[in-house]
């Protein structure tokens, strides 16, 4: 508890009295409003624009107006032209995106159809795999190797793809033999 009525400015040398049950710490006295506010000035000086003009003429740096440096490329251009240019830029952007997607699909799609093998970034027939791997990285050599061995690879592929091909070819041979036997008889 705090005992009312004491002041900071009064320093007591007495022993605190414990009989009334209060401590001897004094309360802070309220502040006077006059102590917080400064007195209002007698004169208020307000500079107008005409009073600032002599400062510019004295050689002080003046900030340039922003309007002096603005350049408008659309001034005098019709709205139709602006929309046309905007549409052309949008089409050019979309074309670039489409080409990028097509390139990525072409470059990174490594799935080959059945009967083909992916080798050296190309899908080659399974029958040409041995001949293709023997060639060096010369593209012209690869091309000629594929052309030279095309017939052999075609036969290899057809035999490996269908087991019925041998049966059909044997039937044709037997038919030819019977026809030849009938003609000779």
UniProtKB/Swiss-Prot annotation:
Pfam families: Calcyon. The chain crosses the membrane at residues 83-103. Plays a role in the recycling mechanism in neurons of multiple receptors and acts at the level of early endosomes to promote sorting of receptors toward a recycling pathway. Belongs to the NSG family. Keywords: Cell projection, Cytoplasmic vesicle, Endosome, Golgi apparatus, Lysosome, Membrane, Signal-anchor, Transmembrane, Transmembrane helix. Coiled coil: none annotated. InterPro entries: NSG. PANTHER family: NEURONAL VESICLE TRAFFICKING-ASSOCIATED PROTEIN 1 (PTHR28546:SF3), NEURONAL VESICLE TRAFFICKING-ASSOCIATED PROTEIN 2-RELATED (PTHR28546). One of its GO terms (biological process) is neurotransmitter receptor transport, endosome to postsynaptic membrane. Residues 1-82 are cytoplasmic. It is a single-pass type II membrane protein. The lineage of its organism: Eukaryota, Metazoa, Chordata, Craniata, Vertebrata. This is Neuronal vesicle trafficking-associated protein 1. The keyword Oxidoreductase does not apply. GO terms for cellular component: dendrite; early endosome membrane; endoplasmic reticulum; endosome; glutamatergic synapse; Golgi cisterna membrane; lateral plasma membrane; lysosomal lumen. GO terms for molecular function: clathrin light chain binding. Residues 104-185 are lumenal. It is found in: Membrane; Golgi apparatus, trans-Golgi network membrane; Endosome membrane; Cell projection, Dendrite.
């Amino acid at each position: 508890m705090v005992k009312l009525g004491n002041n900071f400015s009064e320093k007591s040398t007495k022993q605190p009295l414990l009989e009334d049950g209060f401590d001897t710490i004094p309360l802070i006295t309220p502040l006077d409003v006059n102590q917080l506010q400064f007195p209002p000035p007698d004169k208020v000086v307000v500079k107008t624009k005409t009073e600032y003009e002599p400062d510019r003429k004295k050689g002080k740096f003046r900030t340039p107006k922003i309007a002096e440096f603005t350049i408008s490329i659309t001034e005098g251009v019709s709205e139709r032209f602006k929309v046309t240019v905007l549409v052309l830029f949008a089409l050019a952007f979309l074309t670039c995106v489409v080409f990028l997607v097509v390139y990525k699909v072409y470059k990174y799609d490594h799935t080959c159809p059945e009967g083909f093998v992916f080798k050296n970034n190309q899908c080659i027939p399974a029958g040409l795999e041995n001949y293709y791997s023997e060639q060096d990285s010369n593209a012209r050599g690869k091309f000629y190797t594929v052309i030279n061995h095309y017939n052999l690879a075609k036969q290899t592929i057809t035999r490996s793809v269908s087991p019925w091909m041998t049966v059909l070819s044997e039937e044709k041979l037997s038919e030819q033999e019977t026809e030849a036997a009938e003609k000779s008889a």
